[in-house]
Amino acid sequence: MEHIYLDNAATTPIAPEVIETMTTQMAQDFGNASSTHFFGRQAHTVLDTSRHILAQSINAKDNDIILTSGATESNNMAILQTAQKRANEGKRIITTAIEHHSVLKPMAYLESQGFDVVYLPVNAQGVIELADLKAALTPETILVTIMMGNNEIGSHMPIHEIGQLVHESNAWFHTDATQAYGLLDIDVQEDQIDMLSVSAHKINGPKQIGFLYVNDAIHLPSFLMGGEQEKKRRAGTENIPAVAGFAKAVELLTPAVKAEHRARYAGFKQQVLETLQANGINFEVNGAGSDDMVGHVLNMWVKGVSTYVLQMNLDLAGFAISGGSACTAGDLEPSHVLIAMYGENSPRVAESIRISFGVETTEADVTAFCAALTKIVQKNLAKQAGKA
């Protein structure tokens, strides 16, 4: 049976060029980048070159890039180290109700330590109201962390306007750009972003590597203690093959390639919607009504059929999709994103699926998915009708 992967918001297959780069580095540049001998210098050159590529991708300075194990670590670092450094200036932190759990769980911890965390609501498009942010900002606000693109429904926050508002206050602005990086053009200077988190495995790079951009005016205390790597900001011997692979994945994403991907994903999304409508499937797009979305994610409420049934039957039919964030899907928890948008009693919470396109997705894949989903929905609704 052929298996079709439509869960690219969870992770992506590693690009062949990235694999080639990494295997070459594993064989040739195995030295410790902190060593002063030839092998160390060789590894350090790869590290510097890769860091420059990553920095250029968001219009940042090379020294502003802290290499991490991925966006989870980057988010924790930005939030917890800001709280540690600025606790004497204020205890208010602002975020949203639909952030990734690597933001929400540090927030819960900080609340237990006496911090005042404000969770901004979102509208039915999964976007905050700027007026709510403006009202929540106080002189005691030390950090605002709002994701750039949502991993479950694909909503895209008004980052430029948020940056402007935050910088009228005393707060720092952090954004989790994990889902947007690689699809959208990001400029940390233009958007007045102080800190930004990224993971390589969302852009056809390796897992367990990412970065945290930190504006050079901000000096966070070290997150991991030990050696003096990353200019004393994050201890631990750098993973040179992974860093080089990350940089290669970024190099592949030229502006023209990103534009082509956006156009392809928009076409796939339209194909799904038109096909399911033609097949008589009763569904709605979660977050519908917004023209500003991270284009590879499509979250749908399939009326009358549970998420579990849809996901299980699609898996049996050979399709990899998701009921929400891969980081919580194994727990079968209801989507906190859909609850924030529609309320915990909405049938959408228990009857929605997420599909997410990637560079290897084809029109034939989408056609096959629509046929399989149609068959599954019709079969289950007929079974329900027979029991009535």
How does the language model describe each region?
Residues 1-388:
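Pyridoxal 5′-phosphate
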